[in-house]
C-alpha cells in the first residue's frame, strides 16, 4: 500500500498498452462522441485525417481503465488513494487510427499537503500515451488525493 510519503517526484509507472480496433473506435464514438470521422469510415477517409480515428475521449477513457487496473494489481486501497480533484492541460497531439497501439505511463511531477483535507496530500502526475512509432499521442496532468498519515 502506498502512502503520500512513499511517492517520489519523478517516479514513473508504466500502465500498459491498448490497441484500438475499428469496431471499438466506432462503438465508443456512437455512444459518446458521434462525429463522422469516428463512426463512418468513408466520411473519415474524406476528412482531415484521411481515415477513421479514435475519439480523444476514448484514448482518455482507456487511460482511466489502465489506472484502475494498475491500482487493482497493486491491491491499492481506494480509501487511501482518494478521488481526483481534477486535471489540467489535456492534449490530444496525434490522431489514433484503427490498429494503433498506445502505451501509457505516469510521471509524478509534484506533491503537496492538502489545504482542505487534513491527513491527505495531493499528488500531481503527467500521464502520457505514445503510439507504436514512439510519438506522443495524448497527455494530461492529473491530480489525486493520497492519504498522508503523518500530516
Where are these regions (language model features)?
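HotDog/MaoC-like acyl-thioester-processing domains
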Residues: 1-9, 14, 92-151
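Hot-dog-fold acyl-thioester-processing enzymes
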Residues: 1-85, 150-151
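Short, charged low-complexity intrinsically disordered segments located at boundaries
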Residues: 55-62, 91-99
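Short beta-strand or tight-loop elements
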Residues: 83-88, 104
Amino acid at each position: 500500500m502506498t502512502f503520500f510519503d512513499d511517492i517520489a517526484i519523478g517516479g514513473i509507472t508504466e500502465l500498459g498498452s491498448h490497441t484500438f480496433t475499428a469496431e471499438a473506435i466506432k462503438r465508443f464514438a456512437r455512444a459518446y462522441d458521434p462525429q463522422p470521422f469516428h463512426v463512418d469510415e468513408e466520411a473519415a477517409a474524406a476528412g482531415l485525417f484521411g481515415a477513421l480515428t479514435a475519439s480523444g475521449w476514448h484514448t482518455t477513457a482507456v487511460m482511466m481503465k489502465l489506472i484502475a487496473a494498475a491500482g487493482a494489481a497493486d491491491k491499492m486501497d481506494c480509501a487511501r488513494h482518494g478521488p481526483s480533484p481534477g486535471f489540467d492541460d489535456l492534449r490530444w497531439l496525434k490522431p489514433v487510427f484503427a490498429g494503433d497501439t498506445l502505451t501509457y505511463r505516469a510521471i509524478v511531477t509534484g506533491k503537496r499537503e492538502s489545504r482542505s483535507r487534513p491527513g491527505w496530500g495531493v499528488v500531481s502526475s503527467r500521464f502520457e500515451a505514445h503510439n507504436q512509432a514512439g510519438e506522443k499521442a495524448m497527455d494530461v496532468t492529473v491530480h489525486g488525493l493520497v492519504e498522508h498519515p503523518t500530516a
